[in-house]
Design a protein with these regions (language model features):
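Gram-negative bacterial Sec-dependent N-terminal signal peptides
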Residues: 1-18
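Predominantly soluble domains enriched in secretory-pathway, periplasmic, or organellar proteins
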Residues: 12, 18-321
Length: 321
């Protein structure tokens, strides 16, 4: 059985399971995770974590479901999906072979995004309502360590060798670089923004990119020396980005577009804009770099881009994003 993975947020994750290319989308307004067959462009199921927003049962003293299902991370070898719900302060893990819940882990106020280390031994969760990273042992599901920071962290990504973790902030200009072995901050970089909710590593591992949603910019960091390469303008309400076919795809909510950049040189260059629906947000590419999937927050749709032609080839409804 071969598995490949992709992740998007408000979140989307895709991977190959039993020869079906599946995409998972976290839907924060109906508290579900949509399951999409990416080859047939069809929603094939959902994982229900709670009642939808507005349902009076959410306020029951006996309610034990999740609220504001938001962040996803997938472990390829473990066949495991972690789902963060920001209001109920939880990480729910699912067995992706069966679709059954493994456990629920409570990590602290307003977690944002989970991320498995590349070796899948740990799950690092940014607890941005407080000021720390919650590190979960993926074998036991127990929290093993907290890394305290100056402010609430937004998201974490790793170098390909798992030596360093790069952590953005949701509340100030810090970006922290952490030694994953000692769990100590070894360097801090200052960003041009106090709201940097999304971060990821390029497919070749040479760079880490950080999105600055409030100012519509992205910063590129070299993983060789952990220094800033450049910060470039992307557009109002720049949400997330993905990499495919040696290009970067950025969802720009204020323009309802996906902006495509060539980043082969020192300065990223805009090469095309693709019109999206309403407020494009989460975006990720498949492992082959042939397709890019993104969700539109206000139209509750998933659209698929062919990375060769850079044209939208499919659209389908998902849950209430």
């Amino acid at each position: 059985m071969k598995l490949n993975k992709t992740v998007l947020a408000i979140c989307l994750v895709s991977f190959n399971l039993h020869a079906a290319n599946l995409v998972y989308s976290a839907n924060q307004n109906d508290n579900t995770v949509s399951v999409v067959d990416a080859d047939k462009y069809k929603k094939v199921g959902s994982l229900t974590l709670g009642y939808p927003a507005g349902d009076k049962r959410l306020y029951s003293p006996l309610y034990n479901g999740e609220i504001n299902v938001h962040g996803l991370s997938y472990a390829k070898q473990r066949r495991e999906l972690s789902v963060v719900s920001t209001v109920t302060n939880s990480v729910v893990r699912f067995d992706t072979n069966t679709g059954k819940k493994i456990d629920t882990i409570y990590v602290g106020r307003n977690p944002h995004e989970p991320r498995y280390t590349n070796n899948e031994d740990e799950i690092w969760v940014t607890v941005r309502g407080e000021n720390y990273i919650s590190i979960i042992d993926s074998q036991t599901g127990n929290e093993k360590k907290r890394i305290e920071l100056e402010s609430g962290p937004g998201m974490v990504t790793f170098s390909h060798d798992d030596k360093y973790a790069y952590i953005s902030s949701s509340f100030d200009e810090h970006l922290w670089i952490v030694d994953t072995k000692t769990k100590k901050v070894i360097k801090k970089l200052m960003m041009p923004s106090s709201f940097s909710p999304f971060i990821n590593t390029t497919p070749d591992g040479k760079e880490v990119w950080v999105d600055h949603k409030d100012v519509g910019e992205i910063t590129r960091i070299s993983t060789k020396d952990n220094e800033i390469i450049e910060t470039f303008k992307t557009g109002k309400i720049s949400n997330h980005f993905a990499f495919a076919n040696n290009k970067a795809y950025v969802t720009v909510g204020g323009e309802n577009s996906v902006n495509i950049y060539d980043y082969g040189e020192k300065h990223a260059k805009l090469i095309k804009k693709i019109q999206a629906e309403t407020l494009p947000h989460g975006i990720w590419a498949d492992t082959k770099g042939s397709k890019v999937y993104f969700v539109n927050e206000l139209s509750n749709t998933l659209q698929i881009i062919d990375a060769d032609s850079d044209k939208i080839i499919a659209k389908l409804p998902v849950g209430a994003l």
